[in-house]
């Protein structure tokens, strides 16, 4: 008797099929999800938590930065030795821009590359290292001079952006040149030029000799470590820094080849 005939009857066929093994190739085990999926969910929660913390931190820093009134920067103009950047020769301004912030005229308060480097240095060294724009230095010198914390660096970014929105570049440069320490209790560029060289940075002055290219480079190079670099007894490191500054000034067209060669000749005497 054929197998098909044996189970032609529906009841008999059903009874037989109950005892036949079933093979479901699409069977998925029921139970706990794989560990990989669980790990991914945990990782996503951690990342979300970190993002929320960062957002809260930035929000708090922004709120705290609004307490600093950028209108107060105008008080710098009341200094007796204040000279506006409009009245300073281009090569003098170039000496500081070349050394401190060569993209000064192109950014809006902070330079992403330099700032990122400074923030990582702050985290790793627990100290603030380089990378600040001139605008940021204006903010630091006026509002946060004695604060060297990581939170200061973040607040500085917000305030610098507000400064850029309220003032033009020459005004910002004026605030910088007239509120920075040059050593020997000198806090303005004009005061430093008078004190160290007996010259003036005011191109309209007729009572004093005008500051030279080399003198400009020396003062711009000194602000990095005003208490260390001695103008009257220049170290090899200081001399090299001035030389580098002069090279940058030439490369960025603040001085020509003749001015560069003359300044280098005076430096190497």
Swiss-Prot record:
Pfam families (UniProt xref): Transgly
KW Lyase (keyword) present: no
Keyword tags: Cell membrane, Cell shape, Cell wall biogenesis/degradation, Glycosyltransferase, Membrane, Peptidoglycan synthesis, Transferase, Transmembrane, Transmembrane helix
Pathway: Cell wall biogenesis; peptidoglycan biosynthesis
InterPro entries per UniProt: Glyco_trans_51 (IPR001264), Glycosyltr_51/Transpeptidase (IPR050396), Lysozyme-like_dom_sf (IPR023346), Monofunct_glyco_trans (IPR022978), PBP_transglycosylase (IPR036950)
Keyword Cell membrane: yes
GO biological process, alphabetically ordered: cell wall organization; peptidoglycan biosynthetic process; regulation of cell shape
MF terms (GO), sorted A to Z: peptidoglycan glycosyltransferase activity
Reaction equation(s) it catalyzes: [GlcNAc-(1->4)-Mur2Ac(oyl-L-Ala-gamma-D-Glu-L-Lys-D-Ala-D-Ala)](n)-di-trans,octa-cis-undecaprenyl diphosphate + beta-D-GlcNAc-(1->4)-Mur2Ac(oyl-L-Ala-gamma-D-Glu-L-Lys-D-Ala-D-Ala)-di-trans,octa-cis-undecaprenyl diphosphate = [GlcNAc-(1->4)-Mur2Ac(oyl-L-Ala-gamma-D-Glu-L-Lys-D-Ala-D-Ala)](n+1)-di-trans,octa-cis-undecaprenyl diphosphate + di-trans,octa-cis-undecaprenyl diphosphate + H(+)
Chief localisation class: membrane
Domain of life of the source: Bacteria
Subcellular location: Cell membrane
Enzyme class, first EC level, given as a word: transferase
EC number: 2.4.99.28
GO cellular component: outer membrane-bounded periplasmic space; plasma membrane
Topology of the protein relative to the lipid bilayer: Single-pass membrane protein
Transmembrane segments: 46-66
General function of this protein: Peptidoglycan polymerase that catalyzes glycan chain elongation using lipid-linked disaccharide-pentapeptide as the substrate.
Family: Belongs to the glycosyltransferase 51 family.
Name of the protein: Monofunctional glycosyltransferase
């Amino acid at each position: 008797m054929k197998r098909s005939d044996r189970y032609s009857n529906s009841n008999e066929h059903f009874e037989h099929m109950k005892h036949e093994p079933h093979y479901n190739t699409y069977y998925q085990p029921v139970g706990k999800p794989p560990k990989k999926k669980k790990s991914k969910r945990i990782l996503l929660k951690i990342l979300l938590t970190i993002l929320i913390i960062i957002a809260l931190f930035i929000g708090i820093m922004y709120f705290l930065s609004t307490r600093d009134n950028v209108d107060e920067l105008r008080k710098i103009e009341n200094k007796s030795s204040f000279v506006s950047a409009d009245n300073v020769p281009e090569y003098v301004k170039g000496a500081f821009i070349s050394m401190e912030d060569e993209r000064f005229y192109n950014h809006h308060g902070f330079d992403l590359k330099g700032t990122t480097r400074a923030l990582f240095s702050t985290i790793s060294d627990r100290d603030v290292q380089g990378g600040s724009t001139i605008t940021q230095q204006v903010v630091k010198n006026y509002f946060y001079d004695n604060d060297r914390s990581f939170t200061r660096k973040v607040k500085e970014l917000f305030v610098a952006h507000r400064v850029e929105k309220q003032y033009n570049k020459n005004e910002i440069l004026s605030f910088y040149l007239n509120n920075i320490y040059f050593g020997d209790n000198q806090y303005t560029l004009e005061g430093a030029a008078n004190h160290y060289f007996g010259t003036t940075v005011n191109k309209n002055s007729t009572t004093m000799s005008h500051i030279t290219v080399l003198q400009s480079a020396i003062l711009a190079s000194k602000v990095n470590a005003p208490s260390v670099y001695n103008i009257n007894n220049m170290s090899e490191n200081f001399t090299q820094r001035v030389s580098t500054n002069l090279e940058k000034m030439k490369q960025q067209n603040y001085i020509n080849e003749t001015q560069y060669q003359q300044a280098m000749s005076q430096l190497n005497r």
